[in-house]
Amino acid sequence: MFKTKRSLLNSSIAISFAVLGVQAQAETLELQAESFANSGGTYSDGQPNPVTIYNVNGQGAINFVNAGDYVDYNINALGGEYDIEYFVGTGVTSGPNIEVLVDVNGTWQSQGSVAVPYGSWDDFQSLTPSHTVTLPVGTSTVRLLAVGSTWQWNLESFRLTQVSPVEPVGDADNDGVNDNQDLCPNSPSGVTVDNNGCQITGGTDPGGESFVIQMEAFDSTGSDDSRAKGVIIGERGYPQDKHTVVDSVQTTDWVDYSINFPSSANYSVSMLASGQTDHATAVLYLDGTEINEVPVHTGSQADFANFQLAGSVYIASGTHTIRVQAQSSTGEFSWLWFGDALTFTNLDSDGGNGGEATQDADNDGVLDSSDSCPNTPTGEPADVTGCSASQLDDDNDGVSNNVDQCPNTVAGTEVDADGCEVIFADADNDGIEDSQDFCPNTPAGEAVNNSGCGASQLDADNDGVTNNIDQCPNTPAGTQVDASGCETDNGGEPGDSYYHNGQGLLFGRVDGATNFLGEEGYVANPDNYDVTTDLLETDDAIRANSTEVFRGEIYDADGHIAFYEHIDDSVRLYIDGQLVLSNDSWENSSQTTDLNLTPGWHNFELRLGNADGGSGAVSGIGFGIDVDGGTNFVHPSNLSPSMFRASGQVVVDPILPPSGGIYIQLEDFDETGTVGRVASDPNDGFVKGDSNVGWVTNGDWGKYHNVFLEAGTYRAFITVSTPAGGSYGARVDIDGEPFAWGYFDSTGGWDIAAEYELYGGHLVVESTGNHTLHVEAVGGSDWQWSGDLVRLAKVSDSAVKQPRVYNPNEHIVAEIQGPATGLQYLKTPVEIPLANKVLKSDVWYTYPQNRNLVVDGDTPYADFGATGAFWGHPPEHDFYDDTVIMDWAVNVVDDFQSEGFEYTARGEFDWGYGWFTEFTTNPQPHYVQTLDGRNVRMTFMGYLSHDGYNNNWLSNHSPAFVPFMKSQVDQILKANPDKLMFDTQTNSTRSTDMRTFGGDFSPYAMENFRVWLLKKYSNAQLVSMGINDITSFDYGAYLRAQGITHTDWSNAGDTISGNIPMMEDFIYFNRDVWNQKFAEVLEYIRQQRPNIEIGASTHLFESRGYIFNENITFLSGELNLGARTSISELPTNILVHLKGAQAVDKTLAYFPYPWEFDELRIQNAPRFGRGWVAQAYAYGGLFSIPANVWVGGEVFTWSPGADNYRDIYQFVRAQANLLDGYTSYAKAGYVHAMFSSMKAGFIDGGNQVQSSVKILTEDNINFDMLVFGDAGYPVVPRQADFDKFEYIFYDGDLNYLTAEQQAVLDAQGSKVKHIGQRGTIAGLQINVSINGSVSNETVSAVSRIHETDSTAPYVVHLINRPFAGGVTPILNNVEVAIPASYFPQGVTSAKLHLPDGSSSTVAVSTNANGDTVVSVSNLEVWGILELAH
């Protein structure tokens, strides 16, 4: 389909042009090659279509064009003689020609041909033949035909330029048909004519006057569901029939169009669309009124059809809003359809009847010309005006006649949904209806709020004194007050007290992180410092090395109650003196079952212990209760305060804040700015108010100079107001170093201020004098607080600070090396002893704790045959506290290993942000900084903050980077893990990728870039680049001086485009420094543990951050599996990574991103993941056990079911002898250019490599990759790598090779073939047939042989790729045909092993081609053929 795109102007303008027939008068027509309307040809080049669409450097083009292939283009021209110019390339030295033909009345007439000169397939050069092309006026079809030698040319586009116009032809009778075509030259004015210019007569045939709206030209889009975001513009269809569509359409997504209708009429409305979701519908709205809903389903994303959204709807002339909304007939939230165009057809065109239409569009028996209600619902009787009961409201009460139970309501009466008068009941005459009145006995005359409550009935501050007599209306919770509602004077000193007897629990605190019964130092009856009625303290931070105690009684009304906790450290809950809840894990929650208590009051004591000061709820609520004894836990603050009671003496908390001190009014700042980026905040920094600062968003700061402070230790407080909900915090620095920090809850609204203590930090001023204070907003929420003041209260003269972990003077920073020169080779990984190796049959839990996951009282994952765990997380905080580390070592690592499992400990980058704050205390100078000086926050992991600093990106260029990574090694190795794995994927080279980040322009990065450039270029070269003084050169300043912004860089950096100076150099430099610095860390590990396996989440296809290092011996990480695209067949995109890991001789262990299993949850397809597991092991990888999977959102975790996966993992262990020691076996190599991935938008490589891997896989041509690096690190394979293969395939990414790399490939001679020639080579495929039909796309046959034992059986893994409803269909009558010369020796017999535990000898025969044929049945998702030879 060739679609001329218009700019996205207001649709009403576009429609006016469409209706009036206005055409742009262009003299040049430019056509993209891939936009052909039709293609053909008979040459067998192994492709599914005669020509193929592909991409070259972001441009669409066509390839696989052979002699006899053609492409057709529909065009609309002014007519006349045209020059034609092709943008074409070929790698064939002689023979390729292009002939152009024009369809003239059904006959193709040649316009001439031209030879295509030799060059390169993807180097498109201008070619203008001497002949011209004659085009008729209006629409016509042009054909480009390949003539000459077999392999022809690739085409990017062609251009037709008018050189001689057609003489104009008149239209004397103005009927729209030119005189030279008009068979009725004197038609009366205004009549409707046919294509011959003759009047159409008789009948009520609508004239068919219509116009089309391209759906991507919408005015606005949105959704009624928070999970959806509205549509995007995309492309769907077959290569020869592409449609530009509204894409990513999910349930409730809508598109609006403002359309100027030229005349009042009845219109039919249809939508051209495709869709494979059988419950998808489309709803048509006219000016907000729903007109109709119809199913939209074609069975495929590529097959388009017209769907009638309305058979007839009356629309008055003028501008109207048309909305099309996606819905689901089952109410399911999912992807739905792809919309191309809307067609509006005027049904009331008079059809030559002389004027008045004779239609009745809504079939109600009243002609449209007399119909007052033109859209009467089908089947409803209408009156003489054409209106039905559902369209009338005789008493004008807003309820239509068909449902009005009181049809004669007096005008102005308030009615209910039945049209009957609403009777208003208000017993206390306060103006609030009784059903809505929360205070039914309001004193006469007293003003009330919307709930019907007056001041004498309210107590806003819960101090026991009603609002009408409360002289202190904002008393803090728990304060003892007098009769006027004001605080009683208890002296404010420790020891003063009052007696409490009533609602709530007594709250106290004792020293010690585990002050529990039976522990040393246990305090049975600690002092009570407060009374809490809501237990919100359970979700707050707990003071370091202390235990909070909540005591009193709890009321259980029916004898059923259960409790839950998710507190970061230790918990004990006692009911009637019995321990019912006990947990010391900082990461796992715990809960009770129904306690089945006797109804009534019960003694209650809750103790929460903390060792470090960061404690509180880990996620969700910290402490919860289900009053029905189930699992619907809610925080006590959401329950009635009357369920708790207590009595006892309450004393003043000894840590209550002291009064007075130094006050810093926040509006008196000397400087302000921001290190954050909140799009909705137009201000960079604090905005000064009369007595506060406002518009404070995350990262905003203010500086205050010349603040006089005495040396000593202080306590710090800040007075702020915040929105109703969120995560808030502040940090105070003194003279550039962190002093105090704290996080706090909402104050309840912007107009409610509260003072909070900034409890973290050293809080020490070392010298008396003037200082500069820096106050910064930190925390989870974008919008933070309005600030009044900071108060610093001195509490002692001590000015001693604790030493920091990181001392720069203790570390030597290596000089930055220059770029690699000359051709490079991939380094062979360090040899690891067999006892320590990652084995191909290893089965790993994703997390160690999965082995003990309890489901319905059972541990269903304990019998999976697991050998270890994938992600062993060290403690998230207090990482440098050896007590904490040794607790982890003994209670987690050693405990896991004692059960016979291997523990893989994980070093961190993104999740290590808190460790880095603890390591440096002041991490700010070490962060990545963008071109506009902002920190880069790792938002993909959430909006987190620790010790006063957010989860900002650490720069690899920082001098603290290597010491920090080595410190991780030191701490982790104290636990003696079996293996190490580093989540290197989130190193700061990634900040040069993805448009949300924007590169690293920190001072350390700029300093290192100077050194790198000086080592790559001579002074003369630097001057030619505009660098006159390299010693002072700052790349960021250089770019800003040229007007390049952060946005410019981000957009260009994503795909290395946009002509940004030195961009490629900067990306290569970042990778070089990353490789150098992390190599130092890896060598440090290897010196301490020579035989340990070291893994890293580094992949060839995220080439900006790939680590070329032999000390990494296995690969790991989270990867994309494409479940949101399809769960009807197994993905091939993951095979790119598995083949990449094979190419570098490193096993890949992985797990999918959270959204992948979430999609299986949404589609109720838990067994689809079986295919992911089978495919991983078949290709030599490891897929960790999906036990309790994190899916995010409101669901948090989901279990796809142990029973769905147990047999697969047990099968892996049972067939260890056919997995361990085996490697890929292929007769074909595939050339992969790493630079193609550098320009890709995601970590799965570019479109070309994905396409080629899919083609080879679905042809059952086993292959392995030959890796060619980029210009920054020009890796080439060794000759031994080439020698493994009989043939080597390349594709369109060949143009990314350097000249030197191309020469190495060319040296391999005739074995190098274009991937399109694969079908001409015998002996490469293992052909799989089902019921006699070749079905290579259905079952993949993956061949592997033993690395060292030539007598070991050959192995072919059979992967059944299709799924139906999330389940693999079982296949019978499967035949696997292996070419006689495929393996080194002939196959003599075969056994089939299946996950159901069965192993059987299967028939082996020989077909007419001499292939060995193995017969297989009962194949579900995976089978292993063991082949003797």
UniProtKB/Swiss-Prot annotation:
This is Alpha-agarase. It comes from Alteromonas agarilytica. GO terms for molecular function: alpha-agarase activity; calcium ion binding; carbohydrate binding. Residues 369-378 have a biased composition (Polar residues). InterPro entries: CBM6, Cellulose-bd_IV, Chitinase_insertion_sf, Galactose-bd-like_sf, PA14/GLEYA, Thrombospondin_3-like_rpt, TSP_type-3_rpt. It catalyses: Endohydrolysis of 1,3-alpha-L-galactosidic linkages in agarose, yielding agarotetraose as the major product. It holds the Pfam family CBM_6. SUPFAM superfamilies: Chitinase insertion domain, Galactose-binding domain-like, TSP type-3 repeat. One of its GO terms (biological process) is polysaccharide catabolic process. Keywords: Calcium, Carbohydrate metabolism, Glycosidase, Hydrolase, Metal-binding, Polysaccharide degradation, Repeat, Signal. Residues 29-161, 211-345, 662-793 form the CBM6 domain.
